[in-house]
Amino acid sequence: MSVVSSVTVKVPGTTANLGPGFDCIGAALTIYNQFQFTRLEESGLIIQATGAEAERVPTDESNLIYQAFAKLYQYIDQPAPGVKIEIELGVPLARGLGSSATAIVAANRLAGEPLSQAQVMALAIAIEGHPDNVVPALLGGCRLAATGASGWEICDVPWHSHIVPVLAIPDFELSTSEARRVLPTEYSRADAIFNTAHLGLLLRGLETGKGEWLRAALQDKLHQPYRQALIPGYDAVNTAAVAAGAYGMVISGAGPTLLALADVSHAAAVEAAMSTAWQEAGITAVVRSLALDTHGAT
């Protein structure tokens, strides 16, 4: 394919971990960022952002979207061209809702698609460091990723149509580095077995929509117990969500966004309860009932 002068990519926000699936499972949601990359005739970088928290977007080479763009050109051993990047933000920054590494989809198209989809995926995972956000953002749906003998093995995780993701996005940030810092360097065998068993139960619960399995499955001993203290109001929001009928609540990615899963018949009540709980805790938050995005980056 020939080199093009401008490309636009729409990328869904993602939620990762889903409780016990630490660093290996994620789902694409119906909330989006849009990136337009236009090749400049001369060297240089122009970054313009609109939408949610646009004023906080870096407009120099420290911008993570630009860094992902440049990484692709480095990978194919070509100098990155001058580029204008227009960002339409629908997914707030630093909230545990996705990865800027997905910008390499646009970079690949702008370069004439020198990389296959599998190569783009592998490079995005390498940039991000783990697959749980990148994979569903690129492919859509709920995805599980694990390393195989010859690279990443990625499988689709069936998601029952009655399961609604309810997303609660607070107005404060939590850096991934801080969320990683509080994690222990070693875990007990009992905790490892606990998460393995509950991840299996989660996969079957998502497929069948069976409430008993989902209520039990949305537990974790590897990351959430250590990160909850970094999120003001966590306990109150969790209690409110479950009381309103949610199967359970988890931290989305590294946080601070919280995700509840609920049957479609309880989603509205869960959304209202989570909103009220955070409001009573003195924290402004946007709470939305969403759906699974099945297309990924387009």
Curated annotation (Swiss-Prot):
> Which controlled-vocabulary keywords does the entry list?
Amino-acid biosynthesis, ATP-binding, Cytoplasm, Kinase, Nucleotide-binding, Threonine biosynthesis, Transferase
**Molecular-function GO terms, alphabetical:** ATP binding; homoserine kinase activity
What NCBIfam families is this protein classified in? PRK01212.1-4, thrB
Role, per record: Catalyzes the ATP-dependent phosphorylation of L-homoserine to L-homoserine phosphate.
The listed locations are:
Cytoplasm
Q: Which reaction does it catalyse?
A: L-homoserine + ATP = O-phospho-L-homoserine + ADP + H(+)
Q: What is its EC number?
A: 2.7.1.39
Q: What class of enzyme is it?
A: transferase
Could you tell me which SUPFAM superfamilies the record lists for this protein? GHMP Kinase, C-terminal domain, Ribosomal protein S5 domain 2-like
Q: Whose protein is this, by species?
A: Nostoc sp. (strain PCC 7120 / SAG 25.82 / UTEX 2576)
Its BP terms in the Gene Ontology are: threonine biosynthetic process
| Protein family | Belongs to the GHMP kinase family. Homoserine kinase subfamily.
Q: Which domain of life is it from?
A: Bacteria
One Pfam family it belongs to:
GHMP_kinases_N
Gene Ontology CC terms, in alphabetical order: cytoplasm
The UniProt entry lists the main location of this chain as cytoplasm
The pathway that the record names for this protein is: Amino-acid biosynthesis; L-threonine biosynthesis; L-threonine from L-aspartate: step 4/5
Q: Where does ATP bind?
A: 92-102
Checking HAMAP family in the record gives:
Homoser_kinase (MF_00384)
Supply the name of the protein: Homoserine kinase
Question: Does this entry carry the keyword Phosphoprotein?
Answer: no
